[in-house]
Amino acid sequence: MKTSSTEPTRLRIPPYTVEHHSTRQKYQHALKILGQLHTHGHEAYLCGGCVRDIVMRSEPKDFDIATSATPLQVEALFPRHADLVGKSFGVVIVRAPGDPHIHTEVATFRLDGPYLDGRRPDGVTFATAREDVLRRDFTCNALFLDIRNNTVLDWTGGLPDIQKKILRCVGDPATRFREDRLRLLRAVRFAVQLGFEIEQATWNALCREAGAISTIAPERIRDELTKCLCSPQPARALDLLHDSGLLAILLPEISALRGCEQPPQFHPEGDVYTHTRLMLSQLPPCPDARLAWAVLLHDIGKPATFSRDADGRIRFNTHEFVGADMARALLTRLRFSKDDIEHITACVRNHMTFKDAPQMRPATLKKMLARPTFATELELHRIDCLGCHGDLSIHQFLLQKQQELNREQIKPAPLLNGHDVMTLGIPSGPLLGKILEEAYDLQLENAFADRQAALDWLKNRVVSRTR
């Protein structure tokens, strides 16, 4: 592995072709910045993940630049569009003229000082291109690309590691992980996003240092875990998190699913962990994050509700409600937004209702279809079935009902309101709400031809109540 040579390996690659319009705009903006830096005599390259993606012939999300220019020199070149948000660390954000949403991070070559908090260096000193790459996390991310001649510069062995699909720390793995403990999770994330195997020394250090992950901010842990779950290999991500020891620290509720038996007649696949793992493997490409988390958490309440009947049958009574409360606590701990928490916990709480769908009253079924979370719930149900018995008949039934019923039939405007009830002498309170709910259920079941029919029913309902 090359880590000490003063001269990099150089590889000429084909010119990069951008497919998507939004990426093309970002790329063109980065090229303009590089052009300005080169024109004024500065060394400057595309760096990091975007170079890795270009080498792998995939499309980067963003384009970062590393340069010999100091932050003040960068600011002087782009006086109206530079934001020195990371000036103390040599980082400048350069925004595109006319579109502030398009921006490029421009960082000065640097050496990092000691990482006293396990997150950021205590200070930096400006350095050479080689010194800059030697402080980076993984070899695949420690590449520079000179766009003037389409040449990749590699001081750390990143190019052969990409070719072999190996994730390897730059230099000493333990040092890299201690510098920034989030790299423990990033190693798992890159492995499952890129389809790489984690090199043995890197893996050993990851396992030894796993306990330090608890010092990282919950929001940053949440974001890395979400990227793992939404990667092409979420089931493998779960296994890597478990095998490394990270799962027991970050998500002990999920770790507890291992060894939790299930009734074999309904779950021939095995314990709850195996079921959850199989479901993760059934997620669609690039899934919605709420769906991915709902899959992970849907059976989180099973260990706490495990019981056996006298005949030995395993039961998990009310596990969906216990699980929803546990999911809420977990998601709150990871600082999810209120909307995300409500959406995901609703999916956990409601996932057992699907088995009853073919026998539901029309009103109950329509209310189910009208839930704002129903699309996620339906996909969760489909994946739940694929993760055990494979019977998708209820899923097909609900898809058919969605096709048969339009939005007005599923969730019509109520024919009656609270004022209608109160004019008949019923005060605001539980009884009023109960009457309106009865009326809406009847409306959903097409019991009323029009509003007048609903008013007639209401009068009879109130009279019968007051006799």
Predicted ranges, named:
Residues 1-467:
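Catalytic cores of the polymerase beta-like nucleotidyltransferase superfamily
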